[in-house]
UniProtKB/Swiss-Prot annotation:
Its EC number is 2.1.1.185. It holds the Pfam family SpoU_sub_bind. This is 23S rRNA (guanosine-2'-O-)-methyltransferase RlmB. The gene is rlmB. Coiled coil: none annotated. Keywords: Cytoplasm, Methyltransferase, rRNA processing, S-adenosyl-L-methionine, Transferase. It comes from the Bacteria.
Length: 249
């Protein structure tokens, strides 16, 4: 298990981190010259929870933001676990036959990845799996877009996605891939039990080897004239169909 300090920037991301995971927020930086009342609320909330707050210059915030629009606030987030590929088996085992995994095969846009992670956190997924290559990693933009979910979810970057899917199948995880050209509907699938939902990248969808390692390929029915959805929208639709099935009485 590796740990390191990381910066989260933007009002929503910082608010979410303070409210949901204050024990890992080490300090909050607030732009001294700002008149934004929301920053005052953040400062008061952070102090109530025992988090150090410092008023700093815009230039200081620019430095920790790495070019991402910080909206006058940043938080230093410490002791975030960096999940490793070998952790995946333990996570699935710990889910007790109810693992829900989101697999993103080559998502390149950090805003899309962040939005997917936010939906995944809301759906209560066990872990998110991404390839180490041909995919955006966890960066400041992803953290901001995810409203802090990127640092609370197990996000596992794997060297060989096809191999990881094979290992999941050995743990009795059903692998369902989303593809627009097939006949099987998402709503015909049984998404209870151990399930991995696999979505492709923005440009090319699922890669060939990824498709070949899916147990079933399905599509999201779209009666309108648009033939595809943004990957983050598709992830939300798919995840919450699984949630619906799992929570039916």
């Amino acid at each position: 298990m590796n740990k390191k300090n990381q910066w989260i920037v933007g009002i929503n991301a910082v608010v979410s981190s303070i409210e949901n995971d204050a024990e890992h927020v080490r300090e909050v930086l607030v732009e001294a010259a700002s008149k934004n009342s929301r920053l005052l609320d953040i400062e008061e909330n952070a102090r109530r929870k025992g988090i150090e707050v410092r008023r700093v210059t815009t230039q200081a915030l620019d430095g920790v933001g790495g070019g991402v629009r910080h909206q006058g606030v940043a938080a230093r987030y410490a002791a975030v676990r960096l999940w490793e590929e070998h952790d995946l088996k333990d996570l699935v085992d710990a889910a007790g036959g109810q693992a829900l995994l989101l697999v993103l095969d080559g998502v390149q846009d950090p805003h899309n990845l962040g939005a997917c992670l936010r939906s995944a956190a809301a759906a209560g997924v066990t872990a998110v799996i991404i390839p180490k290559d041909k995919s955006v990693g966890i960066n400041a933009t992803v953290r901001k877009t995810s409203s802090g979910a990127a640092d609370r979810l197990p996000v596992i970057a794997v060297v060989n996605l096809a191999r990881s899917l094979r290992e999941l199948q050995k743990q009795d995880v059903w692998i369902y891939g989303l593809a627009g050209e097939v006949e099987t509907s998402l709503y015909a699938l049984d998404l209870r039990g151990n399930v991995a939902l696999v979505l492709g990248g923005e440009a090319d969808g699922l890669r060939r080897l990824t498709r070949e390692h899916c147990d079933v390929l399905a599509r999201i029915p779209m009666p309108g004239e648009v033939e595809s959805l943004n990957v983050s929208v598709a992830a939300g639709v798919t995840l919450f169909e699984a949630v619906r099935q799992r929570t039916l009485v």
